[in-house]
Amino acid sequence: MATRRRRPRRRRANSSSDREAYLPTGEPCDMHLGVIGLGRMGRIVADRAVDAGHEVTAFDVSDDALAEAAEAGIEPAESIPDLAATLGDPKYIWLMVPAGDPVDAALDELAPHLSASDVVVDGGNSHFADSERRAAETTARYLDCGTSGGPAGAEMGFSLMIGGPADAYEELRPVFDAVATGPAGHDRMGPAGAGHYVKMVHNGVEYALMQAYGEGFELLHEGRYDLDLEAVARTWNNGAVIRSWLLELCEEAFREEGPNLGDVSDHVAGGSTGTWTVREALEREVAVPLIYEALGERFDSRRDGKFSRRLANRLRYGFGRHEVHRE
């Protein structure tokens, strides 16, 4: 197992000095965080915590991921029990593993090593009902954390939507300050499940926004003028009412793939969180026609093709580095 080498703090767009953690007394607060899962998002969580002065021990099933993390100042653990053994009392553990069975499997391994004073954070895209169940079943205090920002969070920080006990949230505030864009980039949404509920709806809104941009650019693409779509996106994103990060990614897509999106397929993957959003809306008798139509377009994209769907396919790579399906 590689030996941990502490790396110097780096200054980013949100400088480390802006994200220093302090106790109510004004004294610096360096916490010891355990991170389980060093994929794209988990590694960013660990890196930003280390950059802010916190100690991080991490476990991943990939030996390569652990070796790379060790080179970056993260203490590698040989197993989940080994990770738990390195942490103090209370233990602070952040799960960043795929939703569903992997979360339950990690919690099962952690269970013998947890006490009521510990805090476990699930930063993945879990269903809010699963988070409610896990909070009730887990000995430790449980925080469900909707995480938005994709790989760009490495530089900018994430937006964190957190549910669970208020005392646990306050204890981990220094870590949330480090991982998020700053103090304004995270908040407690409510009790267990609320964080992942808000993130679910966030994803539904994201579907509708992607669909709207896709339809607009499809009309421009098929319209009566020979337009430079990259220039349109750039112009819109400088002062227009509809400016956004997604629109920046539209500009990037046209610049890198060309005005016709090259060989980008019309197959748009994903859809689970959008499905959850629509089901919840039906249960609550809330009309969400834009989200519903966007979800339907995504499913239809797997059968036939449109320019708007090809753009949505490419945008998923832009914000989340998801696979681009190509012809």
Predicted regions and their residues:
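NAD(P)+-binding Rossmann beta1-loop-alpha1 motif at the extreme N-terminus of oxidoreductases
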Residues: 4-7, 19-91, 151-153
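Serine residues within intrinsically disordered or low-complexity segments
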Residues: 15-17
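ATP-dependent carboxylate/acyl-activation modules
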Residues: 31-38, 45, 178, 317, ...
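Rossmann-like NAD(P)-binding element
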Residues: 40, 61, 74-133, 154-163
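Hydrophobic beta-strand scaffold residues
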Residues: 56, 76, 142-143, 288
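Rossmann-fold dinucleotide-binding core
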Residues: 106, 126-204, 211-214
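Helical "substrate-binding/catalytic lid" subdomain
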Residues: 171, 193-322
